[in-house]
Amino acid sequence: MYKNWRELIKPKRLQVDADSLSDTYGKFMAEPFERGFGTTLGNSLRRVLLSSLQGAAITSVRIKGVLHEFSNIPGVTEDVTDIILNLKGVLLKLHGSDSRNIRIVKKGAGVITAADIITDSHVDVLNPDHHILTCGKDADIELDMVVAMGKGYVPAERNRDDKAPVGTIPIDSLFSPVKKVNFTVTNARVGQITDYDKLILEVLTDGSVRPDDGVAYAAKILKEQLQIFINFDEETETVVEEESEESRKINENLYRSVEELELSVRSANCLKNANIHLIGDLVQRSEAEMLKTQNFGRKSLNEIKDILAEMGLSLGMMLENFPDPEYLKMIQEGKEDL
C-alpha cells in the first residue's frame, strides 16, 4: 500500500504571475504532476471555484408604492423588471456572515447608479458606476434591499421570506465571486523526463475575493471533502535514499539566514518585518504573499527571485518537515565547534 501514493511525484512549487496579479485576476502555475493529474486537479479546482465559494448578493428589494415586479414607477424610465435586472448586476462585498439592509433614496431628476446605494461599514460596493435606474423630475424613489451571503445560484423563490414586509420582491441571486476560470495543461520536465504535467490556472473574480485567496479556499474545500475517503492509517516504512550532492547543497541553503542573500536594504527590511529569517521560510512564501508584505514591491520581488534562482530555489516551494529540529541542532553544533 505504501507505494500506491508515496512514489507518485508531487508538485514542488506554485508560481504566481506577479506582473498580472490584481484584485480580480490571477494566473497560477504548478508543477510537476504525474501524467493526467493536471487535468484531474485543474477541472476539480475549476468546478469548486465556480460553484462553491461564498459571496454577497442582493436577495430582495422593496420599492415604495410598488406591490409586485410587473409595476411601473411614476417618473422612472425603467419598469420594475428592468430595475431588478440591474440590481442583480450590483457587485457587493459583505464583511461578516449576517445579512444587511441597504437603501437608495432619490427625489427629482437624475441617473441612479450603485454609488447612490446607502450602506453601512459592513457592505462595500465594488462597481459604483453600475446603472440602476433613471429618474424624471417628478420621481420620488425609495428602494430597501437585503444583502446576504451565499454560494452558487439561488432562484428568487428560495429567497422569499414570509416574514418580510408587504411589497418585498425576492430576487434571483448569483453569489459566486468567481466569474471565470480557465486551465491548461502542458508538459513539465523532471531531470531528463518530460512526461509530466504542468497546470496553468487563470482565475477572474468580481473583486470581493482575491484570485489567490479563491484558489486557496477551493483547494481547502477539496481537501476536506476528500478526507472522509482516507479510512486507513499510513504504514510506517523507513526508506533510506542516498542524498545527491545537489540536494545536499539546496538543503543547506534552506537553513541559511536571509541576511546571507545580500539583498538591498529595502528588501532586507521587508523580510525582517515579515519575520522571515531563514531562506527556507522565504521560499515557502508565494509571490502573491510576498507582494502583500508592507513596502514590498515588484522590484524587491524580482531581486529575490533572481537570487533564489541562482541557488536552484524559487518562491512557492512546498517543504516537508521544515525546519527540521535535528538539522538545526546539527548546524548549531557545527557553529559552536568553529
Curated annotation (Swiss-Prot):
Its EC number is 2.7.7.6. GO terms for cellular component: cytoplasm; DNA-directed RNA polymerase complex. Disulfide bonds: none annotated. It is an enzyme of class 2 (transferase). Residues 250-338 are annotated as: Alpha C-terminal domain (alpha-CTD). Gene3D superfamilies: 5' to 3' exonuclease, C-terminal subdomain, DNA-directed RNA polymerase, insert domain, RNA polymerase, RBP11-like subunit. CDD domains: RNAP_alpha_NTD (cd06928). Homodimer. The RNAP catalytic core consists of 2 alpha, 1 beta, 1 beta' and 1 omega subunit. When a sigma factor is associated with the core the holoenzyme is formed, which can initiate transcription. Belongs to the RNA polymerase alpha chain family. DNA-dependent RNA polymerase catalyzes the transcription of DNA into RNA using the four ribonucleoside triphosphates as substrates. This is DNA-directed RNA polymerase subunit alpha. It comes from Syntrophotalea carbinolica (strain DSM 2380 / NBRC 103641 / GraBd1) (Pelobacter carbinolicus).
